[in-house]
Amino acid sequence: METGFNSVASMSDGDFLSLYSALAESGIKCEAANCFLPGEMSVTGKNVDYDALYKFIEKGFERCKKLGAETVVFGSGRARDVKDGYPLRECYLQTVRFLKETVAGFCDKYYIDLAIEPLCRQETQVINTLKEACIAASMTDSGRIHVLADIYHMLESGDDYANILAVGSDLIHAHISYPVSTGRHKRVYPNEKYGFDYSEFIDNLKKVGCPRVSIEGSTDDFENDLISSYEVMKKFR
């Protein structure tokens, strides 16, 4: 399963113990965590509180490690968006410095990789494509900071599936959904009934050896949607 880093880091000790115990009893492994930072915890602009970031991230990494997580996803569009009239380039560089100087050390300490998630421009102006994420990852000089491909954000940003091949082995995680608005939701659990063609996305993930893919989307009927989604997920084998 993939949990929420922000939620795990913000839990009371009692709530975390309950989560840990429930997972242990179920036998389900928490392999990844997304939703890295709350929107108000900025890594760009003039009001970056590095002390608060450090404490929050350390607590989250420590807890995610206990849950068994191997990968943390850095989306957090509001946290890394352009702020305070800063130029886009400066906000991009601030984001890279944050990853290099604050996050990379925790990745090494807890043996957890971080995947930079390119987001569509409606959610952030900083890192919108796989290429931009690759450049950011390389600038951190960390062997544990890599890239994620999300089918919804790729379509929204016009990021061609072929660009997955250019990322190569640096692509360590992926998100899948039915990436078309259904009215109430902008993306939902994948389902063959929608007739969406995942073949190129799936084939390219396989070609680069992407080790993990998870569902990121909304559902109004979790149990039945999960069963239907399994038919799509099996194609990644």
Regions found by a protein language model. Give the residues of each.
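Short N-terminal signal/transit or membrane-insertion segments
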Residues: M1-M11, T102-F106, I145, A149
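Histidine-acidic metal/acid-base catalytic patches
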Residues: Y54, G68-A69, I127-A149, L155-R237
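Active-site loop signature of alpha/beta-hydrolase-fold enzymes
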Residues: P38, R121, M154, S181-T182
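Short histidine/acidic/glycine/proline-rich micro-motifs that form metal-
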Residues: G4-S10, C120-E123, I151-L155, S218-F222
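A structural alpha-helix within SAM-dependent methyltransferase catalytic domains
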Residues: Y20, A24, E58-F61, K65, ...
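Conserved beta-strand positions
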Residues: M1-T3, F74, I116, A149, ...
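Active-site acidic/histidine proton-transfer and metal-coordination neighborhood
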Residues: T44-H146, E156
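Structural motif corresponding to the early beta-alpha repeats
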Residues: E2-Q94, H185, P211-R212, T219-D220
